[in-house]
UniProtKB/Swiss-Prot annotation:
Its main location: endoplasmic reticulum. Pfam families: Rhomboid (PF01694). It comes from the Eukaryota. This is Rhomboid-related protein 4.
Length: 318
């Protein structure tokens, strides 16, 4: 497994263009740092892909535990990087403003490691159950497992409703599982176990004990999940409206300020589908002009996020 050599990193250029369209000042700090870290490791890989990818054989049997830290931050090529980090961009904007920067950093770090651990457990279990040792040698890189975990969180905080996947309405609570199958039907080169591990980690946080365990550990470190931006508390009610409330610990009057919902600022006026269409068009153009074409690492960006954005914007405008 070697990173493909390409004359022009079209995916990276497209990613940087999208970041600058959003505006660096509009991206929360932990989200921005996550983007920068993924880009930095792509441009300056610490090890070759084969030495940083995650597998049962290399990580568990040969005790190369550093792969748990390296594998989420390495990507096979610029398109693999683009699809993952473009998804990090909008998920980070939504979740970091809801959870607070310190807690979001804690979530990202925990999910990055735990997704790898669950991936190893899944691969080991399948290899033993099917008596097929090749599963122990299957090696994976990329941030998409963490993205699936974040998608579970996002659906948890915005419950109800349906999303359109391949033309079929799917309840929000099942969307991740349907996307998991759809991605691997159309992009068989992606890691099914890695994405499934992300979903399971997300469910461990929203439905299981993970959040309480993290809160208990965070209490020892002096911060909790209620921490937000200084001087502000995020509010969200069942009708779908949200915003920020100034918080004064000494009893000054509270008032609400609606959080800006102009998502055109974040997407340069393009929906998720339009961004994906442009990316795929650029990918096809690039494929026709280079000898080495990108592998099917395209992360499926479903239209659910754009539908949710429009719904929230409609509530805010009432």
């Amino acid at each position: 497994m070697q990173r493909r050599s390409r004359g022009i990193n079209t995916g990276l250029i497209l990613l940087l263009s999208q970041i600058f369209h959003v505006g660096i000042n509009n991206i929360p700090p932990v989200t921005l740092a996550t983007l920068a870290l993924n880009i930095w490791f792509f441009l300056n890989p610490q090890k070759p892909l084969y030495s940083s990818c995650l597998s049962v054989e290399k990580c568990y049997q040969q005790r190369d535990w550093q792969r748990l830290l390296l594998s989420p931050l390495h990507h096979a090529d610029d398109w693999h990087l683009y699809f993952n980090t473009a998804s990090v961009l909008w998920k980070g904007i939504n979740l970091e403003r809801r959870l607070g920067s310190r807690w979001f950093a804690y979530v990202i770090t925990t999910f990055s490691v735990l997704t790898g651990v669950v991936y190893l457990l899944l691969q080991f279990a399948v290899a033993e159950f099917m008596d097929e040792p090749d599963f122990k040698r299957s090696c994976a890189v990329g941030f998409s497992g963490v993205l699936f975990a974040l998608k579970v969180l996002n659906n948890h905080y915005c419950p109800g409703g349906f999303v359109n996947i391949l033309g079929f309405p799917v309840p929000n609570r099942f969307a991740c599982w349907v996307e998991l199958v759809a991605i691997h039907l159309f992009s068989p080169g992606t890691s099914f176990a890695g994405h499934q591990a992300g979903i399971l980690v997300g469910l461990m946080y929203t439905q299981g004990p993970l959040k309480k365990i993290m809160e208990a550990c965070a209490g020892l470190g002096g911060f909790s999940s209620s921490v937000g931006y200084p001087g502000q508390q995020y509010y969200f009610n069942s009708s779908g409206s949200s915003g920020y409330q100034d918080y004064y610990p000494h009893g000054r009057p509270d008032h609400y300020e609606e959080a800006p919902r102009n998502y055109d600022t974040y997407t340069a006026g393009l929906s998720e589908e339009e961004q994906l269409e442009r990316a795929l068009q650029a990918s096809l153009w690039d494929r026709g002009h280079t000898r080495n074409s990108p592998p099917p690492y395209g992360f499926h960006l479903s239209p659910e996020e754009e539908m949710r954005r429009q719904r929230l914007h409609r509530f805010d405008s009432q």
